Amino acid sequence: MNTSLTNAARLFTAGLRALLVLTVVTGIVYPLVVTGVAQGLFPGKANGSEIKADGKVVGSSLIGQSYNLPLKEGRETPEPDLRWFQGRPANGLGTNTVNTRYELILSGATNRSADDPELLQWVQDAKAAVVRDNSVPGHPVRPEDVPADAVTSSGSGLDPDISPRYADLQVHRVAAKNGLPAERVQELVDEHTTPRTLGFIGEPRVNVLELNIALVELVAPGAGH
């Protein structure tokens, strides 16, 4: 009997020691080491890849934003503010219905098949809107000019980047809405186009938030987003 109690006590003590050691190592030491390394080597990425304008954090280079006009009465969705470059559609985004205390965005894809009738209608409507919104006198946009990323959302619905082709398509509209030379706006796009990583990984891309922040510097004071 005493032997059984002794063995049980020994096992309990060993388990308790293991629990305490692992708690300290994995719950305190490891997080502190990882945090220290991240802050020391990659402080920007460790803090969320924040983007600042006028000394204030205005977003993250990893998360897309919408550039819309105030929601009008009677409408379910706001209209895009055509003074600014627009990102990809966000059809997969949902709303937080579990904890309504916080206004959280639930990211995700539509999970619809390529031949889904509603998805096809979304794409057709989005293409028509891109053609309509970006056609300016002397520079009409044709349906075949519209790239895929202009009418389809990403897997997360929060893609911060667009293709250079989609950015180029918006140049004349942005220039006209802001009273700027199209050539200067095109230069802005070119300056904010990131090439393929290492020259062969991924595709060239344009971060919409960074581009619009640069655009603010060109427009009249007080016209910022």
Swiss-Prot record:
Compartments, record wording: Cell membrane
Chaperone keyword on record: no
Entry keywords, A to Z: ATP-binding, Cell membrane, Ion transport, Membrane, Nucleotide-binding, Potassium, Potassium transport, Transmembrane, Transmembrane helix, Transport
Membrane topology reported for the UniProt record: Single-pass membrane protein
GO cellular component labels: plasma membrane
GO BP terms: potassium ion transmembrane transport
Transmembrane segments: 18-38
Record carries keyword Transcription regulation: no
UniProt xrefs under InterPro entries: KdpC
GO MF terms held by the record: ATP binding; P-type potassium transmembrane transporter activity
Location of region: Disordered: 134-161
Protein family according to the UniProt entry: Belongs to the KdpC family.
Subunit structure: The system is composed of three essential subunits: KdpA, KdpB and KdpC.
Free-text function comment from the UniProt entry: Part of the high-affinity ATP-driven potassium transport (or Kdp) system, which catalyzes the hydrolysis of ATP coupled with the electrogenic transport of potassium into the cytoplasm. This subunit acts as a catalytic chaperone that increases the ATP-binding affinity of the ATP-hydrolyzing subunit KdpB by the formation of a transient KdpB/KdpC/ATP ternary complex.
Listed name of the protein: Potassium-transporting ATPase KdpC subunit
Protein source organism: Streptomyces coelicolor (strain ATCC BAA-471 / A3(2) / M145)
Gene that produces this protein: kdpC
